[in-house]
Curated annotation (Swiss-Prot):
Highest classification ranks of the organism: Eukaryota, Viridiplantae, Streptophyta, Embryophyta, Tracheophyta
Protein name from the UniProt record: Oleosin 18 kDa
Chain segments carrying region Disordered: 147-172
Subcellular location: Lipid droplet; Membrane
Function: May have a structural role to stabilize the lipid body during desiccation of the seed by preventing coalescence of the oil. Probably interacts with both lipid and phospholipid moieties of lipid bodies. May also provide recognition signals for specific lipase anchorage in lipolysis during seedling growth.
Annotated membrane topology: Multi-pass membrane protein
Claim: Transmembrane is one of the keywords in the record: yes
Chain segments annotated as transmembrane: 42-62, 70-90, 91-111
Keyword Ion transport in annotation: no
Organism: Oryza sativa subsp. indica
């Protein structure tokens, strides 16, 4: 009965050590909710701004190509020409602003990802070291259990051999 109690205590102790080992392997600091929300917001926003930048640039070029001959042929007055130039400049500035916003958003996202990946090797090395320690500990405990079983087998063998040899046969 005492052996069972010791085995139960041993199991509970080993189970606690394994739990601590697993906790040690997992990263202690995960991305916060605000960081995850930032990434989830900025990535689509950056892509959308880049798409809008491209559309604004394309619309400016097409509008300039279509409106220039119309204004020159039908109304050679300075007001429509100034309007045309103003709209073209506004289109190019809008395109540049949207492109700059998209690029800055994606740059921030790339820097955040780079910083996260630079921290990862520390966690990997720490996990590798803890796994090696756990494997060495398991090997040590296995060797102890093997020695204990060997000792019990030796005791059982010497106890049976000391019984007087009632079942042995001698030849004359």
């Amino acid at each position: 009965m005492a052996d069972r109690d010791r085995a139960g205590q041993y199991y509970q102790q080993q189970r606690g050590q394994v739990g601590e080992t697993v906790k040690g392997i997992l990263p202690e600091k995960a991305p916060s909710a605000s960081q995850a929300l930032t990434v989830a917001t900025l990535f689509p926003l950056g892509g959308l701004l880049l798409v809008l930048s491209g559309l604004a640039l394309a619309a400016s070029v097409v509008g300039l190509a279509v409106a220039t001959p119309v204004f020159l042929i039908f109304s050679p007055v300075l007001v429509p020409a100034a309007l045309l130039i103003g709209l073209a400049v506004a289109g190019f500035l809008t395109s540049g602003a949207l492109g700059l916003g998209g690029l800055s958003s994606l740059t921030f996202l790339a820097n955040t990802a780079r910083q996260a990946f630079q921290r990862t090797p520390d966690y990997v090395e720490q996990a590798r070291r803890r796994m090696a320690e756990a494997a060495a500990h398991a090997g040590h405990k296995t060797a102890q259990a093997g020695h204990a079983i060997q000792g019990r087998a030796d005791q059982a063998g010497t106890g049976a051999g000391a019984g007087g040899g009632a079942g042995t046969k001698t030849s004359s």
